[in-house]
Structures are given as C-alpha cells and as structure tokens.
Amino acid sequence: MLNFFAAAPKGFEYSLAQELTEFGATEIKESVAGVYFTAPLTLAYRITLWTRLASRIVLVIYKGPCESAEQLYNAAYCIDWSAHFSNRNTFSIDFHGTGGFINNTQFGALKIKDAIVDRFRDDGDARPNVARIDADIKVDAHFRNGVITIAMNFSGPSLHQRGYRSTTGEAPLKENLAANMLVRSGWKAAPTTLLDPFCGSGTVLIEAALMAADIAPGLQRNRFGFEHWRRHDKATWHEIVEEAKARASLGVKRCEVKFYGSDIDSRLVALAKRNAQNAGVLELIEFNVANALNVEPPAAEGYLITNPPYGERLGSVSELLQLYYQLGDKFKKEFGGWKVAMLCSDIELISALKLKADKQMKMFNGALECAFNLYTLHAQSTRRDTPVLPEGVDIADIAPAFANRIKKNAKQFEKWAQKEGIDSYRLYDADIPEYNVAVDKYLDYVVVQEYMAPASIPEAVTKRRLSDVLLALPAAIGVDPHKIIMKTRERQKGTNQYQKLDERKLELITTEYGAKFKLNLTGYLDTGLFLDHRLTRRLVGQKSKGRRVLNLFSYTGSASVHAALGGAKSVTTVDMSNTYLAWAKENFALNNLSGKQYEFVQADCLQWIRDCNEQYDLIFIDPPTFSNSKRMEDSFDVQRDHVNLLGMLIKLLSPNGELVFSNNKRKFKMDTETLTKMKIKVQNIDDMTLPLDYKRNPHIHNTWLITHADK
C-alpha cells in the first residue's frame, strides 16, 4: 500500500473524502484543503484518472518531526531517491510553509535539494540536475507545526485542467469547482435534466455530461507526474486508460440525460460549443444564445445549476441586484418542481433572490469565498421576507417606506432644481433611519453612499436593507440601473478624506448657477463637488466683485470658479494635492477663465498661511475636520486648532475684508470668547448657506462670516 495526499480547494474536503471512499481507498483522513489516503498502485492510477474533485495527488514519501535545518536535511537525505528517479531525470522542489528555523520557503527548498543531490553522490551516482520549469520529477514539501512532509507530485499539472478548454471566458469557473457544485447539489447522485442559463464557456454542463456519460475527466490529459517515476507500471496504466476509453465510447451512446445551456454572449456560447466538442460531449448538450430572464424550463422538473455574474465592479451593483431579483421572480413563477443551485460571492445578490434556501454552503472560487445555496422550487414557492408581488406591482414595493420617500423628494426637488439652475443635488439623506444611505442625483446618474452602520446592527440586516434600496431606486425615481453608482462612506479619518476608489473614470459636466464643473463619479469617494456647499460657493461669487480672493484647501477649485465668474480682481487657489489643482484648472478652462490674475499654488495650506505676506479682501477656507497627511508637518484638528488658524488668517485679511470659514465637524463649537479678545468678529451664517436639499441634515456643515472686530 502507498500513502497519498489529494489536495483540493478549501471546502472540498468532505466531497473529496466521499469520492475516495467510493473509489475504494482506505485510511481516509480529511485535512485542511485535502485528504490523506492509502491505496495500491493500480487504484492510485485509477483515482488519478477519474477524480473529478482533486487538484493534485502526491505520493507521500516521508512525514515526521522537524525542528532544525539539520533535521530537515536528514529527513530528505534518508530517502532512497534513486528508487524513485534516475540521475538522468531533472527535478524541482516546491516548498510550502515557514516558521521556527525556516524563515522563507527558498531556504527549505535549498536544504532538500542539497540532501537529494548529496544522497545520489554518496550512493555513487552522478548528481541529477535541477530544472525550474518542466522538471521530470517534482518534489512537494510541506512544513507545518514542526512536521515536515516530503512527497512526489504523482498527478502532474493541476487536475482541474482536463484538456478540453481551448480558451477561457471572463471569470472562468475551474472544472473541479463545477464538479463539486454538481456533487453537493445532489445532481450527481441522481442525474436528470440540467439547465445552466449563465453557461459561459460551458464548464458546469461539460462536467455534468462527463459524469453522466461515464467519461474519465483525465482522459484527455497528455501529462502525468508519475511518468518518469521509476516504479511506474506502464502496462497497468495503459490498461486503465484503454478501459476508460471504452467506457467513454459506450457512455456517450447510452446517455439519456438532457443538458441545456445558454448565455447572452454569443462569443461565450461559441466557446462553450468548442469546449464541449473537445470534451466529446457536444452531442449531449443543447446550447443557445439567450437572456437568462427569457429562458424557459425545458422539462417539468430538473436541476438549474449555475454561476451567475457577480463582482465588485463599481457601478454594477444595482444592475446585478435587479438581475437577481428578477431571476428569483422567474424561478418562483416558472420553475415549480425544479431544484436550483447557485454559486455567488455576494450575499447581497443572493438575498435579492428573495427565496429561502434549503441549504447554504461555502465554496472557494480561487481565493474568493462564495456561497453555494440550494433551493427547492415548489409550485407555490414564495419569496422570503416579502409578500409575493401581484403581476404589475411596482418593484419599489419591496421597500415601500424608502421608495415612497425618495419618490416624494424627487418630485419636489426636480422643479426646485430647474428653478435654481442646478442639475446635481441630494435626493435623500438617511431620511428613514433603517435605510442609512445618501442618494445624490448628478444629471441622469445617481450615486448611493452607504453610511457606516452602528455596530449593534447585524451585517446581514444592513446588507439586506442596502440591497432593497438599490432594487427600489430604478422604479421609484425612473433611473436606469446602469446609471446607479454605489459607494461606501465611513467616518472620515485623516488622509482618507479624499480616498481613491477606482482607476476608471465616469466624467460628467454639471451646471451650478451658471458655472460648469467636471465631476468624476467613480474615481474617488467624493465626486469633485461638495453639493452641501452650493450656496456657500454662490455667496463667495456674490462677494467677489473687484476683490482679491483667496481659496484655501480648495479641493477642485469650485469656489474659485464662482469667485472668478463673480468678477474677482484676482483669485489664488491653494491645495496640497496636485491632482485637485489640475482638476481646478480644468474647471477654470470649462468656464473660459484664463489669465495671470488666476494663480494655482500647490502647498501645505497651513504652512503657506504662515509664510504668506499678502493681503486679501475675501478668503474662503473649508479645512478638513482632521488631517495627518504625510506632506503636513503636524496633524490638524479643526476643533482644537481653529482659534490659531483664524488668528493667522485675520492677518492676511484686508481691513474691510471678509473671511468665510466652514467645516464639517458636527459638534463643532466656535470659541467666540477667545476670538472676541483677539478682536475677531464672528457671525454664524448656517441659515444662509444650507440648501433646500440639505435642510433635513442641518449639521452637515458649519459656516461663519468673519471680519475684523473694529469694522
């Protein structure tokens, strides 16, 4: 009997152990990401050819304690390597694990390599050569918890590579993952009609057809790890392969199970057909180009097993939620009598099905943890957490309180925005506490920002509520799901103030009281325009005529644009970020503003204020609540440091000048007593600067008009 370890993705251990038991292996023991077993050579060959779940099978040669480099060397040296391969063969070492005396895997691999070479030499043979690529013999070594396992790669390249895939589609599903889906769903135990409406390159259907037609998954592989092993029994292996070929030929002819696959992408369907042809099962599968929402059940009952689209692509969340919701509705109405098994990494999407799962399991698609849910669809299958919707009922009814509120807001603000001369505004700001989001409209796009939920609310609850918001929006306000962009806003912390989100850009031009501004809806958490400061910017513009204007912490320079359009004599725009200064220059260009009177300065604003000797007639400053940027020498806290800041700024203010000071700290308290002693006059102007669309959130910012006290 020989000792083996069958490696597999995490979550496969139970299924793999069952498969090995069915093969007739003994001493089966589940481990992390694999299963140990014993088998005679003939059975090991058969398992290697027929396993549908294992990624790799290794022959365990040594396993024992290892607490030093010397012990590691001795463990490898004690093996009679010449009994396993010739010195004419090349070999490589694949070492996994660190800890204790092993600081890196290269050190461990080198020790084993030295031991192998020395053992050949000491036995009177020439040393074999190491080959980094395509070695004849691959030695696998694993070090964990003071135990070293030394093995030989028996199966060769990863067993999920069946040999039938020509090229992969986007986000391909590994073959052994598809096989495990078929096993855990219960389909393999009782093969029946199978449908995959998101078939992609056909992996689930092809793996199922291989099972139903009794075709060995390794039959088309042209390389195995044992081929250069000295104990390899070519005659026995040939006999096993020939037997598998005969079974495959007969199995295809006898197979009565029906397979149906479709995908909306014709290129993927063509690829699926090529893969099925390569696998020898094309005649068993009916492929079509179709939208999954239009696919009808091909039989009264069967299995629908699929891996629908999911992912984190910014802007796609609402579209995907709509898809999943409609899928759940279709399953409920049209697939009574069917079983559904679905693999998805996003619990929000799964919850959008609104169906109760019979069983929920975890599987890994590569490094991505996924949910694998099983559903039984009865003729009167009902949705979970929501009543069955009668035909024609608005989808927004899944979150009626939210839908009704935002519909009402949209009706109110649309007329107001047209009258104001703006096309970007806030529609909803956590009006209903359960739906803790902000919804902003930018032309015909909508940006949804999720606020950080209290720790007392379970994550599943917040995700479900967010899912309902995104599902309700299209019908509630008439927005295209493609044009809903999802962002997550957390409590502002230092340099996260302008957090970069995505390299891709979705840029628009918005209009505000005659000024034009560039927006980037996907590149950053913020879009380039703080909507709550709309009236503050207009106020700056109204006060700018003939004045020297300074804009500090300028961001994308929108207040500077209003100042310039308002007739400012000069405008100086200061920000620490070159990116935002470049953006500010673009905004000036959009408004046909150019000239030497417009200056853009990249600098630490606090240091720039200390060094400045100029005076200005109008200063606008909207500093961060807190900042500890690497470019700043000291941290800044607006509550702690505002008196010192205003004391420096008042020196830059001309005798009749005005300073507009704003910040977003909700519990900010102006130290008027100290400022009065400094002969600084402060006047709160929140009522003047709070737009109608932010009246529900009066603490969104604090704004003050500041002058010299003797004026």
Curated annotation (Swiss-Prot):
Main location: cytoplasm
Swiss-Prot/TrEMBL catalytic activity: guanosine(2445) in 23S rRNA + S-adenosyl-L-methionine = N(2)-methylguanosine(2445) in 23S rRNA + S-adenosyl-L-homocysteine + H(+); guanosine(2069) in 23S rRNA + S-adenosyl-L-methionine = N(2)-methylguanosine(2069) in 23S rRNA + S-adenosyl-L-homocysteine + H(+)
SUPFAM superfamilies from the UniProt entry: S-adenosyl-L-methionine-dependent methyltransferases
Location in the cell: Cytoplasm
Top-level class of the enzyme under EC nomenclature: transferase
Superkingdom of the source species: Bacteria
GO cellular component: cytoplasm
Pfam families: Methyltrans_SAM, RlmL_1st, THUMP, UPF0020
Gene3D superfamilies referenced in this protein's UniProt entry, alphabetically: 3.30.2130.30, RNA methyltransferase domain (HRMD) like, Vaccinia Virus protein VP39
Annotated THUMP domain residues: 43-154
EC number: 2.1.1.173, 2.1.1.264
GO molecular function, one term: rRNA (guanine-N2-)-methyltransferase activity
Family named by the database record: Belongs to the methyltransferase superfamily. RlmKL family.
PANTHER family xref list: RIBOSOMAL RNA LARGE SUBUNIT METHYLTRANSFERASE K/L, RIBOSOMAL RNA LARGE SUBUNIT METHYLTRANSFERASE K_L
Function, as annotated: Specifically methylates the guanine in position 2445 (m2G2445) and the guanine in position 2069 (m7G2069) of 23S rRNA.
NCBIfam families per record: PRK11783.1
Protein's recorded name: Ribosomal RNA large subunit methyltransferase K/L
Organism, as annotated: Shewanella oneidensis (strain ATCC 700550 / JCM 31522 / CIP 106686 / LMG 19005 / NCIMB 14063 / MR-1)
